[in-house]
Amino acid sequence: MDTNTSGEELLAKARKPYTITKQRERWTEDEHERFLEALRLYGRAWQRIEEHIGTKTAVQIRSHAQKFFTKLEKEAEVKGIPVCQALDIEIPPPRPKRKPNTPYPRKPGNNGTSSSQVSSAKDAKLVSSASSSQLNQAFLDLEKMPFSEKTSTGKENQDENCSGVSTVNKYPLPTKQVSGDIETSKTSTVDNAVQDVPKKNKDKDGNDGTTVHSMQNYPWHFHADIVNGNIAKCPQNHPSGMVSQDFMFHPMREETHGHANLQATTASATTTASHQAFPACHSQDDYRSFLQISSTFSNLIMSTLLQNPAAHAAATFAASVWPYASVGNSGDSSTPMSSSPPSITAIAAATVAAATAWWASHGLLPVCAPAPITCVPFSTVAVPTPAMTEMDTVENTQPFEKQNTALQDQNLASKSPASSSDDSDETGVTKLNADSKTNDDKIEEVVVTAAVHDSNTAQKKNLVDRSSCGSNTPSGSDAETDALDKMEKDKEDVKETDENQPDVIELNNRKIKMRDNNSNNNATTDSWKEVSEEGRIAFQALFARERLPQSFSPPQVAENVNRKQSDTSMPLAPNFKSQDSCAADQEGVVMIGVGTCKSLKTRQTGFKPYKRCSMEVKESQVGNINNQSDEKVCKRLRLEGEAST
């Protein structure tokens, strides 16, 4: 036994010593009886049980109750009887727990409080997720909802519901404001549109005043009806010498002048310097064909200009001034083309204008009667050229001063005077083709002829095309032979009809002289140098005066010439009244020829512009006699023009 005790002591010594810091709680029998009485009376109200016992604290009472209840349950399980029957005591249910201030997720449906809380949360979620179009209605429905559900569930539920309502209050007000802004902006836009519509209608109704005036001031102004393809109410400004696209594809005259009040304005507009940069095209196909023709002709001019560097430099310099000066009547050139650099079309236009100024001043173009052609000429080249007769109006004077330099550097060889005995084969055949077209195309083609004449011979042969003035090949070519045959046939026709006319006899003599000169293709070029030297003197005189001789023409001269220009602005159009237009064309040709012949006599004595302008007025009346005699030539022109299309 001692050994055991000694062994126990050894084991006790081996353990780590510990101290009891808290006195173990001891319940007396009296305290336990009062505890049981308080449970029957108050249940789990520990503070009241504390007051009933009087010697123990609430914490101690609760701890004692936990131990006591656990002991009772174990005893009941051992005995197999319910706790309430073993002891005459009913264990009170646990007190409901306090809801924490932070609403963390917990199981729903524990009591009525949580269900009301979930329903209020669902209401707030439905309102906040509504679309912008239904947000105001949802907000009104939320305002009508009773608040009994929200206010009866305690402090925490009230806080949550208020937060939900506040979120709803945040959204509809700015949405309402934004929608109001949108509505006001739409309303203002509609108001502006309504205010703009009468203005536009007023502009359309005032066609006879404002629209025509703007079209005269701005040459590249397109009426709104042109874009839609309706040309009936839009007057066309057809500059003299230019055949419009309308007459090529829509030959009816009533289409272009549908508005009766605008015919007089249109007729007067053709006499000004306002030109359409592009003829009106009624469809995309017409526009594509027009662009193809104009680009082909412009490329031809540019190729010849590039082969002659001096002519190209002069034409570029003149073209840089051309778009600004060609506006004519307008005080401000606010067109899109005015700010663009010189283009191919502008260079070609400047070259043509320079040649026109020279021929109008000196009359260096010996004119013969028009010959029949086999192809439709380039009548729709979009070059803003001025009027191509001798007498131009005052508006065209400023571009000529700048553009006469282009012709200086292009050799004037191919434009030799008709009075000299060594007119070359090139100029004769070129004039033959040029006279069969409008005055506009005549000037352009001879300019191209001059440039091609200065280029290489191999490139001359590549440019053989009768419709585009490529007939200036050597005299042995087939193109020139055909052209000469047609010239002889036409000369015989003119002799049959106009044998008694002195002017026509003189023209025929000139054609015979040109035909005889075809064999003298290698003649000397001394007279050409004299012409170019004289041209330099003339240009210096022009620049010193800063005015051209056309600006000194009297008003009645401009009226007579412009009346003939409006007649000759639409020749060679198929299915059109080609008889009248051809008669007018013949009249213009005779007028140019007579004026040229008379002015060449005074060429050797100096530069005399005033006599030339006055003589043209007298001799322009001579061409009226030839109107009836040229019907045969006009019919041949029309038939061959139709056959080539």
UniProtKB/Swiss-Prot annotation:
Main location: nucleus
Tissues in which the UniProt entry reports expression: Expressed in leaves, roots, stems, flowers and siliques.
Compositionally biased intervals (Basic and acidic residues): 149-158, 197-207, 483-498
InterPro entries noted in UniProt: Homeodomain-like_sf, Myb_dom, Myb_dom_plants, SANT/Myb, SANT_dom
Record PTM: Phosphorylated by CK2.
Keywords, sorted A to Z: Biological rhythms, DNA-binding, Nucleus, Phosphoprotein, Transcription, Transcription regulation
Designated name of the protein: Protein LHY
Organism: Arabidopsis thaliana
Lineage: Eukaryota, Viridiplantae, Streptophyta, Embryophyta, Tracheophyta
Primary gene name: LHY
